[in-house]
Structures are given as structure tokens and as C-alpha cells.
Amino acid sequence: NNFERDIERRQMRDEIYRRDAVETYKYDGTVQDLLDNPNDISDFIRHHLEAQVPRLQMLDDYYQGLNFNIMRNKRRREKHLADNRAAHDFASYITDFINGYCFGHAIQVQSDKEMTQSKLNELHSLNDVDSHNRSLGLDLSIFGRAYEYIIRNQEDEVRFYKSDPRNTFVIYDTSVEKNSLMAIRYWKVATEDSVELTEVESNIYYVDVITDQATYFYEANSVTNLELSERKPPEAHSFGKVTITEFSNNEKRRGDF
């Protein structure tokens, strides 16, 4: 598709055409093997940052109408000629139309058992599931993937949240069943408003590693090759599964534009 390929964007050509930009992460080992070898987790995070995030960010820019060739300052060689091209939001039109078509009618989850249905209704009401599903659908259309994060909060409530594909991924085993080993969430601690930070401080990432038994909390720094160090003790959970689920728009993990 022309939005995603954008053949004139020479400065980003390597990022656009990287075949591993839609790679599904797999690990030939157990969850404990990964936890015992944190450098392997760092390698996955580094690859996601370098190979996948640039493409995902570009797709989000297109959705917001930030067309690279139109928005850049020097966009044509003939400086003496006019350039009246205008930025457009065709990507937004495509995504919003498809999202409305797919999720305009709420997904129904029903049970024949009255007590079960009552619990489902309470859960759906608490989490505004219809809006939540539409939000997941938006990410599916833009990025080709979406992530749902389930937690039990301090009030002992089960809550559903969306996790950004630009800082979330799942690592699977190598079996044909494609079982989730763990999910990774990471984010940069420093913001654009942060001032007077050293080079080390401005490149710190917080990393959450979610397994089927617990969530582990790490700190990493791009200056030290994203080497992980524990930032606080792990917290056990009782879900018995990795609580981040990845949804794909299609087999190729491609969006709608």
C-alpha cells in the first residue's frame, strides 16, 4: 500500500523495507530460561526499538495527517517553482470507516447461566468494554496489531487496558501452538520537558516483564546496551496466563492503509 511504502521517503527507506519490521518474536526455551538470561530480553527490546518502532510511528503519523513528504521543509528540487501540495488524512478516513464498520455494533458475549451472565455484565460495565474494543480496533487498523492488558487493581477489580504497540510486544515459544512465554512493556522515563539530565539519565527505560505467574520490574539504559537491572521486587498474580494478549489484523500483521 502507498501509505506504508511511500517510495519517495528515501531517508526512511531502510526502516520501511526491513523485513523484520513485522517479525513475531519467538524464543527456543522456557520462561525461566529467559528470566535467567536477561540479556536475551534486552536483545528483543533493542530489536523492537530499532526495527519495529520506526515503522509503527510512521503509520501513526499518517493517521494523524503528518505526511512526511508534504510536511518537510525542502520537498522539491526546483526551489523557484511553487509547491501547493497539501497534507491529507486519507489514512484516518480509511481507519475510522473500517473501525466503525467492524465495531459499530457491539460484540455480544452471552451465557445461558444467569449468574455467569450477571458477572459478565458487571465486568463489561466496569471496563466499558464496547469502547475498549473500538480502541483496540483502532490500533489494529493503524498498526496491524493491538495489545490488551488485564490486571487486578488495588480494589480487587479486574480491569482491561490497551497497551501501545510502539512499546509492547509478546514473546512466543517455538511450538506450532504459539504459546505466549512473556509480554514486554517498556517506556522512556525522561520526557521532552525533562531538563538538566545527564546522558545516562535521559536514556533510562522502565521495563515490565509479564509472565503467567508474575510481573517483573526492571530498569534499562540505552547507554549500557539496555542491560536490565531490577528496579523493584516482582509482583505475583493469580491469572495463570500472560496477561497481555496480542491481536493481529491479519496474518501479515498489516494495517488497513
Language model features with spans:
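Extended, helix-rich architectural segments
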Residues: 1-161, 177-178
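Extended, charged amphipathic alpha-helical segments
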Residues: 218-257
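Generic low-complexity segments that are intrinsically disordered, proline-rich and/or Lys/Arg-biased
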Residues: 39, 55, 166, 234-238
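Short amphipathic alpha-helical surface micro-motifs
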Residues: 23, 128-132, 165-166, 238-244
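Extended, Lys/Arg-enriched charged tracts that mediate electrostatic binding to polyanionic substrates
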Residues: 127-231
